Amino acid sequence: MRVALISTSIFALCCSSNVRAEAVLPVNPSPYLVGAITRNMFRVPKPDQDLVLLSAHRGSWEVYPENSAYALQDAWNSQIEAVEVDARFTADKEVILSHDYRMERESTGTGFLYDQNYSQVQQADLRDRHGRVFKDSRGRNAKFMTFSAALDLLAQYVTDDGHGYVMIIDVKGAVDDQDPTDPIELTQRCLDILAAKKNPKLSKAVVFKLKAKDAVDIGTFLNRTTYDPNVMGGLIVVENPDDQNVKDSNYDPHEDTIYDQWNVAPFPVQFEMNQFYKGDGLQAYLDYVDQKQGFATYHESNYYPEGVANSAGKCCFEHNTDPRSVAHGGIVPDYRGEPEMAIVNRTNLITTDWPDVVADMLRQLGRRNTSKLSR
């Protein structure tokens, strides 16, 4: 296995894109310490805590294209302490940032990302959330970013004295039988690219996010990659990767052996859940008194038409949502876009497409004391 990892590392170093990221917006210095961000991210949440962290999902893409350099910088320049980006392979194993595995919704390109080389992908221009081809005030289009370029962009915010922001990497797996992506291989490639930067402070600003249903999955991840919890910023586990995983209202997390496994993990692990509707049994875990690890929630935004675009770039993704709701026109409503549902929960981190709105809500509730991130 170690030989395989070394081979992967050599491949990554010789084949990764050499294009460095240009700052498309001004680089405003961060008032936050990276160590303070990750420390608060992975502590045990308390009902009376006065700081809930925010992660801008795919950056700030109200105006800018999602997962673009513009979206990342706009979030950081707005002093949102973390952004979450999506990592995928192209056909020639370049790691790029893209939520979808089809190109049409996000860009002027067509077809599957895993069928196209990076040089082909770079011919496409990114769209904004309304489907319009993006141009900035200087007439520049936005392009798909490589993971390497995203790291270079983050590095411009990470300083020698420890200030900076955090980037969370959501590693995407295979989406169909034709997609050859192995999420472990993709994660290792990301680790190789990061290691090649030879920047320990940058490594501490990167958090990986993966799907895992139990401790066996985590063990597989640790055995098959060079991930080192002493080097990286941290690890977030998506506990409910199955969109049908909605708990009954009488669900008792104290009887769930999976959560007991997370509680005894030998290093900090934060696990994240999508809460599907108010009263979902997952709410019980948010108030779980025996919780010993960090906890995060995510809610999606219901842009018109109602629903959430899936990774094929199609609308709408039929989640198993509130059984009391009634679907209209064949679309199953998805109520996770209500930020009010997330801010009342006991959680360390909220990943949101509305970081500015949720930040204001938390501030009004006395739960956005970001002065803690400066010490």
UniProtKB/Swiss-Prot annotation:
State the UniProt keywords alphabetically. Answer: Plasmid
Q: Which domain of life is it from?
A: Bacteria
Q: Which Pfam families match?
A: GDPD (PF03009)
Coiled-coil boundaries:
none
Which PROSITE patterns does the entry link to?
Answer: GP_PDE
User: Which example biological process does GO assign this protein?
Assistant: ethanolamine metabolic process
Q: Where is the GP-PDE domain?
A: 52-301
Q: Which PANTHER family match?
A: GLYCEROPHOSPHODIESTER PHOSPHODIESTERASE 1
Q: What is this protein called?
A: Uncharacterized protein y4eD
| Organism encoding this protein | Sinorhizobium fredii (strain NBRC 101917 / NGR234)
Q: What is the lineage of its organism?
A: Bacteria, Pseudomonadati, Pseudomonadota, Alphaproteobacteria, Hyphomicrobiales
